[in-house]
């Protein structure tokens, strides 16, 4: 563990000390085959672990601040030989929450949209349905949320990308008697500027249904994406 992270942990534990919790996620997988390059083992395995530390402190009956720090460890083996070893921050954010407002700053997950596969709104995440950990890379961002009433929530964000430029966006989520609507925009002024616009909808009825549609436009091209899906829960053992 690097010294700055240890110093940060001590400082936050002292500041937030009202509530401290920890958890972790571990996974392992193996792969074997008969078409193996010379000198390589027929068996490959991977191990991963994400320990997470959470701290929180109440400010009033309706507001609190909290902090989360998670580190991801990944190892890949060929037989008993170590092929790769990665260690990096997975989440590192601080948040203020009140009855109608939330602000979160740091390395965090930003995910939205109703679809689970073929996701047109997978703009800032790497969630893969084939990955049993259901984990995604984080983004360095400031995200704000407002909740004017029970049927409306408004998001805004500023994200720092790998080129150290800031991109900006926002989202509105509306609940109605016929379903849940989402409207999203994002502007990325990087080397090749892009504008993104999206509409999504989910209806939870006898048969659930959802829609995601997005337009990504730049000087060179326009990309249109649409995902439509439905689901039905069988009344077994209910």
What residue spans do the PLM features occupy?
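Extracellular loop and loop/strand-boundary signature of outer-membrane beta-barrel proteins
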Residues: 36-41, 78-80, 127-130, 187, ...
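Outer membrane beta-barrel
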Residues: 56-153, 175
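Outer-membrane beta-barrel proteins
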Residues: 33-37, 76-80, 112-117, 165, ...
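Sec-dependent signal peptide recognition
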Residues: 2-9
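Surface-exposed strand-loop-strand hairpins of Gram-negative outer-membrane beta-barrel proteins
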Residues: 29-49
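Short N-terminal segments immediately surrounding and downstream of signal-peptide cleavage
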Residues: 19-33
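Hydrophobic h-region of N-terminal signal peptides that target proteins for export
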Residues: 9-17
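Signature for the C-terminal beta-barrel architecture of outer-membrane proteins
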Residues: 19-21, 60-65, 99-100, 129-238
């Amino acid at each position: 563990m690097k010294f700055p992270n240890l110093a940060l942990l001590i400082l936050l534990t002292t500041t937030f000390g009202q509530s401290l919790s920890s958890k972790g996620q571990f996974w392992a997988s193996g792969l074997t085959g008969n078409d193996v390059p010379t000198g390589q083992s027929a068996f490959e395995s991977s191990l991963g672990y994400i320990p997470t530390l959470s701290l929180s402190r109440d400010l009033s009956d309706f507001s609190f601040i909290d902090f989360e720090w998670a580190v991801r460890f990944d190892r890949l083996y060929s037989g008993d030989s170590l092929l790769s070893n990665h260690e990096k921050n997975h989440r590192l954010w601080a948040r203020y929450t009140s009855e109608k407002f939330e602000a979160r700053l740091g390395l965090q997950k930003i995910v939205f949209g109703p679809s689970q596969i073929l996701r047109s709104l997978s703009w800032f995440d790497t969630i893969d349905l084939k990955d049993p950990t259901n984990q995604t890379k984080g983004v360095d961002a400031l995200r704000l949320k407002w909740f004017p009433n029970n049927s409306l929530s408004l998001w805004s964000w500023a994200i720092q990308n790998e080129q150290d430029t800031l991109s900006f966006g926002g989202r509105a989520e509306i609940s109605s008697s016929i379903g849940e609507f989402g409207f999203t925009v994002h502007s990325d002024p990087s080397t090749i500027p892009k504008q993104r616009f999206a509409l999504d909808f989910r209806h939870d009825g006898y048969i659930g249904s959802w829609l995601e549609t997005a337009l990504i436009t730049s000087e060179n091209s326009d990309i249109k994406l649409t995902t439509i899906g439905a689901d039905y829960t069988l009344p077994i053992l209910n």
